[in-house]
Amino acid sequence: SAASDVYKRQVVDPMGGAAQGYLADLLRELGVEVHEIHAGQASDQEDICPDPVEPWVDTCERAVIEDGACAGLVTDGDADRIGAVDERGRYIHPHQIMALVLGDLVQFRNLEGRVVVNLSCSTLVRRIAEALGCRVTVKPVGFKYIAAEMKKGGVLIGGEEAGGIGIAAHMPERDGILACLILCELMAKTDAPLGVLVDQLEDSFGKTSYGRRDLRLEAEDAETLRTLLPGVNPKSICGKVPQNVSHMDGLRLAFEDDTWLLVRPSGTEPVVRVYAEGFSVEERDELLDAGCALARGTYPL
């Protein structure tokens, strides 16, 4: 029952990491035709960063199109994070994956519980969680905060922007292979390739444009920003008035229309991560530009 005839072709990309042979073999046992890339001895010779995001998933995107596969399933080096590619070779973001997995757990498996996300997560996950009757808990960036919440009980699923998705009934930790298997089963149950599932999701819950920029600063500038940020309360950004200002982890501004901006200095290096979500690429980029200016101290507050 795990795969209908139409969706028996998948590209699996373990990125030369721990999922080599595992995910591909599990799917083959279920009758899926699998093309595994970045695996076996050849993978040692390839220059790849085992991070399931663009540009590192480009090879997988090409393989999906060449094979006429219904999806590409990507796991990072230690197989706890997931990325995906749809049948059109389009990169599917972890938020979209988490939203699909959540929908599957509630609608097909009749499970319930809280949904735990980092504050850098897309509002898409919150919108679908609320529509499905799940309460949402927001934590700082880092899966350890989500895992701690899972251990308290009552949690269905937890996920982070970087692609870590954990299902509490399985274990309070991320599992990229499990997330891939659930995606596969969902394609079989709905008889739809991945891109169609994502389009349906966005038709129902709204389409947004999400982005992140990593800004490298001088060490002392990063330290200054870390010190000053808790006191920053902008009255408006890009002509929008923040409805909610959070200093839980960096500075997060949420606007009335569900768009938002997060400026978050790294705890380990002189890098500031700027995240934003808008209803168009232009709006998202305008917010990202403002966030970068804010981090550099050049935004007029």
Task: Label each residue range with its predicted role.
Residues S1-S4, K8-T190, D203:
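Phosphate-binding chemistry for phosphorylated carbohydrates and sugar-nucleotides
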Residues A71, L111-L301:
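Phosphate-binding and adjacent anionic-ligand microenvironments
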